[in-house]
């Protein structure tokens, strides 16, 4: 972590604080991107969650062909969002 040491010296901030704030910023950016992608998928299908997406499949209101990629992507993104939130809580 030479970069952290150099930058903390230049900015005259505590190395640990710079590291912590850098991680928070990274996680917030990752969370924003994740939420943006979730928004795009949920808007596309007029749903609010992967559970709602699954209900559309069960009711036959949506075809699996051409949509399953979005379903699995949304499922992954929702799980990732929760992990990021948990990581951010640990840094508070």
Question: In which residue ranges do the predicted regions lie?
Answer:
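Short, charge-rich amphipathic alpha-helices with coiled-coil/heptad character
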Residues: 1-24
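Short E/K-rich amphipathic alpha-helical oligomerization segments
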Residues: 42-64
């Amino acid at each position: 972590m030479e970069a952290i040491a150099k930058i903390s010296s230049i900015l005259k901030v505590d190395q640990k604080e710079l590291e912590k704030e850098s991680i928070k910023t990274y996680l917030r950016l990752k969370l924003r991107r994740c939420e943006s992608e979730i928004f795009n998928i949920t808007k596309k299908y007029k749903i609010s969650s992967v559970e709602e997406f699954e209900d559309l499949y069960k009711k036959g209101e949506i075809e699996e062909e051409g949509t399953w990629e979005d379903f699995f992507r949304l499922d992954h993104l929702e799980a990732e969002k929760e992990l990021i939130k948990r990581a951010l809580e640990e840094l508070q």
